[in-house]
Amino acid sequence: GADESLLDTYQAERSPHVRRIVESAVGFGRIICTLDVDEAAGRDQTMIAAREANPVDIGGAPMPSLSGSNLVTDGAGYVVGDSRIEGRILDELLDGRWAVIGREDSLTDDDRRVLSGLDAVVIDDDGDIVIVRPDRIVFGTGRTALEALADVANRYSLAG
């Protein structure tokens, strides 16, 4: 199994993430739950005007990324989006495992050894390499992420 020090990364990684989510929820709560009638009317007018000025649906609230551990690389740490690859739902392809999405022919023999040791799934797709953790968090992208994954697999004895 994995080295027990892997568990030490959990608090460092999740605490800032949860803090940002709670702060965001409190901020939205202040906007939504005002008891002042005049303040609520002003808020409503501002939001209606903003929606009319820019009617494009921007989706849900942004989700903060994970940070604070070596289990994500710079610019990563977000939950991978729901999508389809070759007509299949990405969750079905990920199957709760490490995954590499991208051009399979860009992987080196060393990459393949690391991925095999992790029992990672390789999803051949056009575009840059994206590495997804078993918890659906983007570990990183590109060649540097593949190298970082090899380091993490070694450091925490993740390879079988």
Give the positions of each predicted feature:
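Helical substrate-recognition/capping region of FAD-dependent monooxygenase/halogenase enzymes
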Residues: 2-160
